[in-house]
Regions:
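Active-site neighborhoods and metal-handling regions in enzymes and metal-associated proteins
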Residues: 1-264
């Protein structure tokens, strides 16, 4: 395992990349409504990223089990947990949820963030899943401080979600991030306090709870990218990129624009 500690200047570059990702999610948020296809959202995201001088990291991302990822964002609707491929057949409907995972490479460093959106009016049960998953993200971030361990992050996420009856995905994790989209260490959403890699100043990690309404079992689709819940129940996914900076967690990505639009 090789963990790359970032300098103050490198963290600033990562902040810029992650702010662009946050702005891209904000741009996508303007178009989340019934009747829109996931391919339309992908085109909006790719244009915005490229117009701002960056490269969509996910596009052509390699897959050891199949074809490279063909799009600029992952669009995971309802029971799709992660890696949904945008297409012109998936049309958003009132009551859907859609997780949009976005990555961008700007000036040599990566940004990565995900937000689960409501399409129109969703049920109170689904809203609670989203709220709990977002809360778990921030509880995990609170534990991303120098001197704690990776297990402290996962334990905080797991305890919050499982105490409310939700499934915590094991097979998919957060990760280190920097010049590469996926670096060491892995950041699971479960664990034991005080276990795992020691957190140090300069580490940059993506924390991303992936939480299911029902059983946590996952099923891989034939495209070798799309991963769904096996029981067909919905899943939520929220992600921030965080720097352990001056001893504490600093969130480099942003939901500010998305949440502003949600309030209006």
């Amino acid at each position: 395992m090789k963990i790359f500690l970032k300098t103050e200047d490198e963290i600033e570059l990562m902040r810029n990349a992650n702010q662009l990702v946050g702005n891209t999610l904000g741009e996508i948020a303007k178009h989340i409504k019934p009747g829109v296809t996931t391919l339309q959202l992908d085109k909006i995201a790719e244009s915005y990223i490229r117009d701002n001088g960056a490269i969509p990291t996910f596009k052509n991302y390699p897959n050891p089990f199949g074809q490279p990822f063909p799009a600029s964002i992952c669009t995971s609707v309802n029971d799709v947990v992660v890696h949904g491929i945008p297409d012109n057949k998936t049309v958003l409907r009132d009551g859907d949820i859609i997780s949009v995972d976005c990555g961008a490479l700007l000036n040599g460093f990566n940004g990565d963030s995900c937000y689960t959106f409501c399409v129109g009016e969703v049920s109170a049960e689904v809203k609670q899943l989203l709220q709990t998953t977002k809360e778990a993200l921030y509880l995990g971030i609170e534990n991303a401080v120098a001197g704690k361990h990776i297990g402290d992050i996962g334990h905080a996420v797991q305890a919050h979600c499982e105490s409310r009856g939700y499934g915590v995905v094991r097979e998919l994790t957060g990760h280190g991030i920097g010049r590469e989209m996926h670096e060491d260490p892995s950041v699971p959403n479960y664990g034991t306090s005080g276990s795992g890699v020691l957190l140090k100043a300069g580490m940059c990690i993506a924390i991303e709870p992936m939480i299911t309404m029902g059983d946590r079992s996952l099923c891989m689709m034939p495209d070798r990218w799309t991963i769904k819940t096996c029981d067909g129940k919905p899943a939520a996914h929220f992600e921030h990129t965080v720097a352990i900076y001056r001893g504490k967690a600093e969130i480099l990505s942003s939901f500010e624009e998305v949440e502003r639009l949600e309030r209006n």
